[in-house]
Curated annotation (Swiss-Prot):
It is found in: Cytoplasm. Disulfide bonds: none annotated. PANTHER family: SUGAR KINASE, XYLULOSE KINASE. This is Probable D-xylulose kinase A. It comes from Emericella nidulans (strain FGSC A4 / ATCC 38163 / CBS 112.46 / NRRL 194 / M139) (Aspergillus nidulans).
Amino acid sequence: MSSRSSSPLKGPLYIGFDLSTQQLKGLVVNSDLKVVYSSIFDFDADSQGFPIKKGVLTNEAEHEVFAPVALWLQALDSVLDGLKKQGLDFSHVRGISGAGQQHGSVYWGQDAEKLLNGLDAGKRLQEQLEGAFSHPYSPNWQDSSTQKECDEFDEYLGGADKLAEATGSKAHHRFTGPQILRFQKKYPDVYKKTSRISLVSSFLASLFLGHIAPLDISDVCGMNLWNIHKGAYDEDLLKLCAGPHGVEDLKRKLGDVPEDGGIDLGKVHRYYVDRYGFSPECTVIPSTGDNPATILALPLRPSDAMVSLGTSTTFLMSTPSYKADPATHFFNHPTTPGLYMFMLCYKNGGLAREKIRDAINDAKNEKNPSNPWANFDSVALQTPPLGQTSPSDPMKMGLFFPRPEIVPNLRAGQWLFNYDPSTGNLTETLNGEGWNRPADEARAIIESQMLSLRLRSRGLTSSPGGDIPAQPRRVYLVGGGSKNKTIAKIAGEILGGSEGVYKLEIGDNACALGAAYKAVWALERKKDQTFEDLIGARWHEEEFIEKIADGYQKEAFERYGKAVEGFEKMEQRVLEQEGRK
C-alpha cells in the first residue's frame, strides 16, 4: 500500500523505515516533519514464496519463532518501488535511518561484504543477497526457545539483579546474547562460518551502505551483552556467550558501537543511486530498535509515558534515572547522552486482545462483522471497572497469555481470580465461577495489561503537583490499538495522566516516523543541539496529536490503586503454582 501527501515538496527529504514483525514501512518527511510519501509492504499479503503467518515461521517443538531474512530483502525493493511509482524524486533524499524489530539477529556468511559491495542495479536485492547469510533465518522477539541459556546468563554475574544492573535487563528469551549462545551450541559449524552478526536495525543500515553497519548505541542494550555503566561489551558475558569459540572471535563478529546515535555512517551504495535515483551524497544514519525509535516520534518529556499497542504491549518512558530492576528494561537513549529509555514489554498484546474479541464475536454468531471490534468495545464499556457492580463485590482480574509471557515469566495459559481488597483474600476461579465469559474478559484483558504497566512503573513516576498522586503527565498511545477509544478510556482510568490520554496521529507508523525524525536531527542539528530541542522547535502539537480520553480521575485511580495490590498477589500466586519465582 502506498500513499502520498498533497503538500508541495520543498527542500531536503528524509526516509525512515520500520522493519517490524508483520510489515516493512517507509515514510518520507521534509525538514518541517511533515509526511509527504509512505509505502507499506505487508509480509503475509504481499510477499511471494514464503509460507509465513503473521510474518514468521514457527517450530512449536522447540518454541522457536523466526523470520526468513530473504523476505526482508524482497520487502525493501518493493517499498522503494512503491515510493518510486508515487513520483518520489529520490535525488532530494538527504538522509536515511530506520527502526528494526529489537533483539533479532542476522548471521552473515564469509562472502557478505563482497556481495553487499557488489550489488548490481539491474537485479533485485533478494536475487543477489540470498547467499550472503550463513543462516537463512532471524529469531523473532516471540521466540521462547532459550530458557536454559537465560538461566546461564542470569547466574553468570551472580543473579538476575546483577545482570540487570550491568546490562539494563535480566536475561530474556528474545535477547540477542542468549539467542547467540543457543545458536553457537546448536549450529557450531555455521557459527564458525559466520563472519558478522547484525541486529535487525544494523542489518537494514547495512543494505543501504553496501557493507556491514555497526550496531546502534541504544539497540545494543537489548542483547544482555553491553555493559551500560562501562559503555562497552561486558567481557564476562562475552566469554559466556562465545563459549569455545572465544571472546575475540565474538567481538569481531559484533563489531564496534559508535556512541553518537546520529553519526554519518557513509553514503548510500551505488545500487540505490543507479536503480532508484538517490543522490550519491545521501547519508545513511544508524538505524535503531523499534522501541527506541518510537520514543523519537515526538519530543517526549521525562514526565510523559508512551504505550505502544501493537502485536506486543509496550510501555516507554525517557528518564535521567537509571534504576535497573529484573522486571524492567533500561537502554541508552537513542539520541541523547545522559538520558535512558525505560521499557516494559509483553509478548501478549494485540494477539491476546484479538483472541477475546474473536470469542465474543463467535458467541454472538458473528463470524466476519464489518467492525470486528464493535462487540468487544460495547461489552468492555458496559462492564463496570474490575467487574464490580458494587464496592463490596470482589474484583475480577486475570492473566491472558495465548503465548508464553516474558513478564512475568510464565507458560501460555489463562488464569482468572476474584480479589477482595477489604480482606486481601485472593481466590482462583478454576471454572470461571462468578465470571460471565467471554464478555467479562473484554474489560478484564485491558485492565490486566494496564495494571501490569502501573505496577511496574510506579517507582519511576512522580506527582505532577498539588494533591495529585504520582503518575505520568501525559499518556501517549501509539500502534494499531491506539485507534481504539475504549482501550484509551480504560488506560487513562488505570494509568492516570494528569493532562489526559493522547493518540499520536500517525501512531501506527510511530517507529518509521521516529526513524525519519532521527535522520532530520542527525543532518540538520547545530553543534551540541539535542534531538529534543531540534524536534521540539519544529513539532506542532496540534497537528500531530489528538486527545482521545480523560486521564486521571480520582475515584477510578484510587480503585485501581487497590487493584494493583491484588494484581501483584495474583502474579505471585501463579508464579508459585507454576514453580517459577
